[in-house]
Amino acid sequence: MVYGDIMNNTLDEYIKKYEQKTKDKFKPKEGFKLFYLPSRGFCELSTTKDNSMLMIYQMAGDGKFWRDFATVFAQMLGIKKLGTICIRENIKAYIRFWGYKVTKKEPLHDGSFIYYAENKEGKKARISPVHIHDDITRISYYVTWDI
């Protein structure tokens, strides 16, 4: 999602928008590299310890651009999976936004679900709950997908 008009914003402006949207204070994640482009926003990336996955952490600005950026970056490193944490309230809308369809819904003991999804290219994704927030209406999810 692009915040407002497509225009150049400073990193501080993107951070302010990130904090307003997430209601969390931005703090650079240790071990992650921050990438920033004035017309696209910012994104933090790092590999897992075994280099099997490229992780996208905090991000603001054009999400589809940063997904594509991370995909190319991972391909350069020979990595075949991407991962992130979704803090959006509507996980099914999030899955659709990225072009996936749920193929399987696995119920968990706490009433939440693990979602398995696939896009038009046959690439698979797994979306699993990681944290149920205090108000119980919001769940954060680990999202991993093949590239």
Question: Where do the model's predicted regions map?
Answer:
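Short, flexible beta-strand-to-coil junctions
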Residues: 38-39, 49, 88-89, 146-147
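Conserved catalytic-core motifs of GNAT/GCN5-like acyltransferases
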Residues: 101-135
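Short amphipathic alpha-helix that is part of the acyltransferase structural core
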Residues: 1-24, 141-146
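Acyl-donor binding region in acyl/amide transferases
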Residues: 49-101, 106-111
